Amino acid sequence: MERYQQLFTRLSEKKEGAFVPFVTLGDPSPEQSLKIIDTLIAAGADALELGVPFSDPLADGPTIQDANLRAFAAGVTSGQCFEMLAAIRQKYPEIPIGLLMYANLVFSNGIDEFYQRCAEVGVDSVLVADVPVVESAAFRAAALRHGIAPIFICPPNADDELLREIASYGRGYTYLVSRAGVTGAEKRAQLPLNHLVAKLNEYHAAPPLQGFGISDPAQVRETVASGAAGAISGSAIVRIIEKNLNQPDVMLSELHAFVSEMKAATRS
């Protein structure tokens, strides 16, 4: 959890926002996935948000669903994902690493065992996409027991009671959703969300990072200008992977260029 605090303090001193890319572990193969993560970090990613392949990712649009299918086709298992996470942490001791999960994957070997494994491989946070705050007690208790930040989604229509609960129970960062629906760069984020950012700050919530539909530098600039601590981009990044499956070197160079541009937009 401390890695997020250190990151946000450092960026605040530099008057920068955070840029956080999302990719699915093992897409399109374990070997290429690790090269992709190296590239994201080299291009300026401030933290990582990583998905573990799941057969029914309800919160995700077709782009990220296809990433899950590619990882499955490559034979990626949850066990392999934890091996990859351990390798990433060993190579990058300071970068915050977050997981975006679904409850069935957390339940499969027991909630406590899951968070213990996360702690062992150096994961900082876990967002369980299909568990709302009101149903999260067992998850967040296990997370905190193992020093893992429980992350909660703040929807654009959140009422005051929900904002207070998110502020009370969330750690690390708050996932501020730009719009209703599933992930996807083809549906643009609804910007800005100044009123929600102001309320979250008033209630001392973990710093808000805005995601869903963030696909160009202008949106990152608007997000940071609204007072959010930064932006998360997934589908736009996964689309670059999808477009270049047969050209792995082109894939990496396009990812580097995209992430560099998005990170630069956090500085304006």
Swiss-Prot record:
Give the highest taxon in the source lineage: Bacteria
- Name one cellular component (GO) term: cytosol
Q: In which pathway does it act?
A: Amino-acid biosynthesis; L-tryptophan biosynthesis; L-tryptophan from chorismate: step 5/5
* Keyword Acyltransferase annotated: no
What are the UniProt keywords, alphabetically?
Amino-acid biosynthesis, Aromatic amino acid biosynthesis, Lyase, Tryptophan biosynthesis
Q: Name one GO molecular function term.
A: tryptophan synthase activity
What Enzyme Commission number(s) does the record list for this chain?
Answer: 4.2.1.20
Which SUPFAM superfamilies does the record associate with it? Ribulose-phoshate binding barrel (SSF51366)
Q: Does the keyword Disulfide bond apply?
A: no
Where's the active site on this chain? Answer: 49, 60
**Substrates-to-products reaction catalysed:** (1S,2R)-1-C-(indol-3-yl)glycerol 3-phosphate + L-serine = D-glyceraldehyde 3-phosphate + L-tryptophan + H2O
Which InterPro entries does the entry mention?
A: Aldolase_TIM, RibuloseP-bd_barrel, Trp_synthase_alpha_AS, Trp_synthase_suA
Its biological purpose is as follows: The alpha subunit is responsible for the aldol cleavage of indoleglycerol phosphate to indole and glyceraldehyde 3-phosphate.
Q: Which PANTHER family match?
A: TRYPTOPHAN SYNTHASE ALPHA CHAIN, CHLOROPLASTIC, TRYPTOPHAN SYNTHASE, ALPHA CHAIN
Q: How does it assemble?
A: Tetramer of two alpha and two beta chains.
Family, per the entry? Belongs to the TrpA family.
What is this protein identified as?
Tryptophan synthase alpha chain
Specify the species. Pectobacterium atrosepticum (strain SCRI 1043 / ATCC BAA-672)
Q: What is the lineage of its organism?
A: Bacteria, Pseudomonadati, Pseudomonadota, Gammaproteobacteria, Enterobacterales
**Recorded name of the encoding gene:** trpA
